Amino acid sequence: MVDGGGGASDLLVIFGITGDLARKMTFRALYRLERHQLLDCPILGVASDDMSVGQLVKWARESIGRTEKIDDAVFDRLAGRLSYLHGDVTDSQLYDSLAELIGSACRPLYYLEMPPALFAPIVENLANVRLLERARVAVEKPFGHDLASALELNARLRAVLGEDQILRVDHFLGKQPVVELEYLRFANQALAELWDRNSISEIHITMAEDFGVEDRGKFYDAVGALRDVVQNHLLQVLALVTMEPPVGSSADDLNDKKAEVFRAMAPLDPDRCVRGQYLGYTEVAGVASDSATETYVALRTEIDNWRWAGVPIFVRAGKELPAKVTEVRLFLRRVPALAFLPNRRPAEPNQIVLRIDPDPGMRLQISAHTDDSWRDIHLDSSFAVDLGEPIRPYERLLYAGLVGDHQLFAREDSIEQTWRIVQPLLDNPGEIHRYDRGSWGPEAAQSLLRGHRGWQSPWLPRGTDA
């Protein structure tokens, strides 16, 4: 096993290049990297579909054209990088052919856009033909389906790869506001001074989707909301919101601080979790008629460390809700009643809102007094307006993988810790509550916040209805 440290990749090998992820995300990201002149290596696609390179190029153009206005010169440069290998990834002969095609490439990036059950077999086959020396391997979530399977997967990968050769892809870590979180927190004294238990009374994280499982019924029914978005996306976001400042600029410096947050979190309590399922879910193709899989989950947790002790954290995620929005909302502590006002009713607590998606931005909600009453005043910033066009998550992650930047990828210990945190909810899932499509989930979710701020209407982009 050879160190897979720094240095840019000189070949990108995409396993599953004819799959759904490539069609929706990967080709678009590659095109945008090519447009920005950030792509500098050949691309070899591997899949079971029997097609020519010309057919792959045509399929890539159709995939990109769904969302991008294509510049022919840019696409022609991208097309010139493409080659294709047809075969079964479980067949050892495929890897002999792959070794011949790779030739003199010395630092390939293998991007595994494949079902998780194939991650370890593919990597082990690559090791058998000595194709892992100085290579990096990117694997898409989910990383296991519980703590035991995550431990097993990590053990099999680590048997043939160093930790610095493994890139665990979670596209949420490539979203602009998530990337910017540590800079927002620690580069701005006005925020840094407020960011602890002395000023923050509670934290809410919402990930709402206004659509159902669509054509992913069979996949989703074996996963559910907790595995699909909470164990990975939302706990990673929570760590970035609550971690201490990294002591240096390396990926390990950042991941060390995230891991500290996870270690300070107790396993989730099933009595502080509400699971829901939207009406009509069991009629979706691929979903069991008696399914108890959750399409909505709300939970309460805490971080038992000096900065956050005693601050409740509420997380909710669901499908078929009124809007598509992901946000983090921090409530500041209420100020005392103001004796110099005729009406001594205290102002509503200030709020800091970070909208991750759509139209990323930050809002500071403050109070103003007019006509003997309090009014909320919103100070809003749109990152697209103030910082320019954002880099798309997969574009950012692909580039980071190609140049060997590990900052945007999850580390082994964090994956295992987040599975440890959610494991009690997998072992004791509890009752499933039905809810109407277009609602904010089951009524039972309100009970989690008894004695605290209720679930807030999310901050939506201007002109968006919910």
From Swiss-Prot:
It comes from the Bacteria. It is an enzyme of class 1 (oxidoreductase). Substrate binds at H171, K175, E209, D228, K319, K324. InterPro entries: G6P_DH (IPR001282), G6P_DH_AS (IPR019796), G6P_DH_C (IPR022675), G6P_DH_NAD-bd (IPR022674), NAD(P)-bd_dom_sf (IPR036291). Pathway: Carbohydrate degradation; pentose phosphate pathway; D-ribulose 5-phosphate from D-glucose 6-phosphate (oxidative stage): step 1/3. Coiled coil: none annotated. It holds the Pfam family G6PD_C. Its EC number is 1.1.1.49. GO terms for biological process: glucose metabolic process; pentose-phosphate shunt, oxidative branch. One of its GO terms (cellular component) is plasma membrane. It catalyses: D-glucose 6-phosphate + NADP(+) = 6-phospho-D-glucono-1,5-lactone + NADPH + H(+). The keyword Oxidoreductase applies. Catalyzes the oxidation of glucose 6-phosphate to 6-phosphogluconolactone. Belongs to the glucose-6-phosphate dehydrogenase family. This is Glucose-6-phosphate 1-dehydrogenase 1. The lineage of its organism: Bacteria, Bacillati, Actinomycetota, Actinomycetes, Mycobacteriales. The gene is zwf1.
